[in-house]
Amino acid sequence: KRQQSVGDSRLSNFRVLRKTAPDAEGWYLRVPGPSSIENVTALTQVSLNSEIETISALNEAARKRGIIHQIIIMIELGDLREGILPGSLIQFYKAVFQLPNIGVLGIGANLGCLSGVPPSVDQLMQLLLYRELLELKFQKRLPLISAGSSVVLPLSLIHI
């Protein structure tokens, strides 16, 4: 049976999802705040993150639940919305890979989200190269790249 996944930015919607489709995989599409950590690990399996303090708190909450919480680490590529700076990637990932109850699914960026400027091929290539660098450095597969909302779709379809 194929896994169903639902992405949302509201934890209240995941409360409903747990009742209606308890086996569906939940992707929390907002960087969790300190007060939402317990709910994020209780209601979702995957979240987007860019702060080591938040990821450490998710690790502790996941440990208490006896689960591995999956994350996509967001990288800042010019939209100035969220994400770690590319120069910090190696140190950041090294710290995250030390956390036993966190699994890293991949990297992401919010391209074209706030500025309204369409993302470029160069930005997509940067994400691909950062993933390759991290996979080679840490010998860990990062299967997913999240490049943003539907604004990225035309660009990705042209260049796949």
Describe every region a protein language model picked out:
Residues 1, 61, 69-70, 76-157:
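Active-site loop/helix belt of alpha/beta enzymes
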Residues 1-44:
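N-terminal active-site wall of soluble small-molecule enzyme domains
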Residues 11-12, 32-34, 52-54, 149-153:
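Short beta->alpha connector loops
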Residues 14, 56-61, 65, 118:
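Active-site-adjacent beta->alpha loops and helix N-cap segments on the catalytic face
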Residues 36-40, 57-61, 82-84:
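Short, charged, surface-exposed secondary-structure boundary motifs
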Residues 39-44, 48-55:
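Active-site beta->alpha loop and helix N-cap motifs at the rims of alpha/beta catalytic domains
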